[in-house]
A protein has these predicted regions:
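Generic protein-terminus/edge-of-domain signal
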Residues: 1-69
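Short acidic-glycine-tyrosine-enriched beta hairpin
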Residues: 65-79
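Short hydrophobic/aromatic patch on the recognition helix
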Residues: 73, 231, 279-280, 284
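A hydrophobic/aromatic-rich effector-binding and dimerization subdomain
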Residues: 89-153
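An amphipathic alpha-helical interaction segment
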Residues: 138-201
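A short, Lys/Arg-enriched amphipathic alpha-helix from helix-turn-helix/homeodomain DNA-binding modules
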Residues: 164, 186-224, 245-263
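Terminal helix-turn-helix DNA-binding modules in bacterial transcription factors
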Residues: 237-275, 297-305
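…primarily DNA-binding HTH/wHTH and HhH modules…
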Residues: 281-305
Length: 305
């Protein structure tokens, strides 16, 4: 049996050495997999950013604690501190497609350094990867080629700024393509929203709130087999509101239903997992503009917020 090991990708050169690619820049590497020889599988622990896509492949990849079947036209983005790849089984694989790796040091002092983690797809699970259309594939390949061409030029005072500009452009395109994916998967996403609602119903029916309090975005995302970032982005696209607000609004409606059925405020606060009635009062007023007591006075005249 082949022993499993994790390769530490401390810099772009470590990855390039693994696949047999020669770099021309210490902080950036673009690899056309068609130009490298077959390699053995390996789990990689990244200290660099990476954007990977394959033209065609059937590879069962690991990412964090999850697995993913790497399909044609799929983009995966990794950030420092993440693990990806496949355990070495002794077989050689011919990778296809492209890879862009860049070290965080390249971004020092740039605007991108400050907001790169705003691209939440770096924290998506691999089974939430971007599936490109043919047009999107061509755009990203074109950018890969432009970065590769720039890397082959003689280094000058502007090269790093140009490279960062290309990288930011690629990230913005990835964000646009993810937005498209959220929209085109509307039917699937609609089913997910129904599952989200059912999850919240089950949470309260099973009295989990009595020991764990209000459900969190992290809890719901995990139950629905998503990363918190992808789940939050998806709910935002579907409802126009954050996942945390969606959970709170669901809770507010439960409070109203309980009050309308004759329960007192302290009883409702306890049943819904609030440590003190004041906590319920504060959240209710924030969302409705008035307190539960005010709601009880208005309930016969004007239901709802």
């Amino acid at each position: 049996m082949v022993m499993s090991k994790i390769l530490k990708i401390r810099n772009v050169g470590d990855y390039s050495q693994w696949v047999g690619h020669t770099d021309t820049h210490p902080l950036v590497s673009v690899i056309d997999y068609a130009e490298v020889s077959p390699v053995r599988h390996c789990l990689n622990n990244y200290s660099v950013y990476g954007i990977f896509f394959h033209d065609e492949a059937n590879i069962d990849l690991a990412y964090g604690c999850g697995k993913y079947d790497y399909k044609e036209g799929t983009v995966i983005c990794v950030a420092p501190g993440q693990i990806g790849g496949k355990e070495d089984n002794g077989e050689l694989v011919k990778l296809t497609g492209w890879a862009l790796l860049f070290h965080p040091d390249l971004l020092q002092g740039t605007a991108l350094e400050k907001h790169i983690r705003e691209y939440s797809f770096f924290d998506y699970r691999v089974n939430e990867a971007l599936h490109m259309t043919d047009e999107e594939h061509d755009i990203l390949v074109s950018l890969m080629r432009q970065i590769k061409d720039e890397l082959q030029k003689k280094h000058d005072a502007l090269q790093d700024a140009i490279l960062v500009g290309y990288i930011e452009l690629m990230l913005n395109f990835c964000q646009r393509f993810y937005n498209r994916q959220f929209i085109t998967r509307k039917l699937v996403n609609s089913d997910m929203l129904m599952k989200f609602d059912q999850l919240l119903r089950d949470y309260y029916e099973e009295k989990i709130q009595l020991t764990s309090g209000m459900p969190t975005v992290q809890y719901c995302a995990a139950k629905l087999c998503m990363s918190a970032n992808y789940f939050g982005d998806l709910i935002k696209k579907m409802t126009g509101d954050t996942a945390s607000n969606y959970i709170r609004q669901n809770l507010i409606q439960r409070v109203k239903n309980e009050l309308a059925s004759g329960a007192n405020i302290s009883q409702v606060a306890y049943e819904l997992g609030f440590e003190y009635p004041q906590h319920l009062n504060r959240m209710f007023k924030k969302f409705c503009g008035y307190t539960p007591t005010d709601y009880l006075k208005l309930i016969q005249k004007k239901p709802g917020c």
